Amino acid sequence: GLWSKIKEAAKAAGKAALNAVTGLVNQGDQPS
């Protein structure tokens, strides 16, 4: 249903945000 689609979208958005934050932290910790 619609609610499950919303939950899936929220889960995907949260994962993407977490990956983005992790990437920024990794860049800060490991200057190239």
UniProtKB/Swiss-Prot annotation:
Tissue expression: Expressed by the skin glands.
UniProt KW keywords: Amphibian defense peptide, Antibiotic, Antimicrobial, Secreted
Domain of life per record: Eukaryota
The UniProt record lists the keyword Endoplasmic reticulum: no
Subcellular location field: Secreted
Chief place where the protein resides: secreted
InterPro entries: Dermaseptin_dom
GO biological-process terms attached to the record: defense response to bacterium
Family membership noted in the UniProt record: Belongs to the frog skin active peptide (FSAP) family. Dermaseptin subfamily.
Its job: Antimicrobial peptide active against the Gram-negative bacterium E.coli (MIC=8 uM) but inactive against the Gram-positive bacterium S.aureus. Also inhibits growth of zoospores of the chytrid fungus B.dendrobatidis at high concentrations (above 25 uM). Shows anticancer activities since it is cytolytic against HepG2 human hepatoma-derived cells (LC(50)=45 uM). Is only weakly hemolytic on human erythrocytes.
Protein name (database record): Dermaseptin-L1
Organism: Agalychnis lemur
Taxonomy of the source species: Eukaryota, Metazoa, Chordata, Craniata, Vertebrata
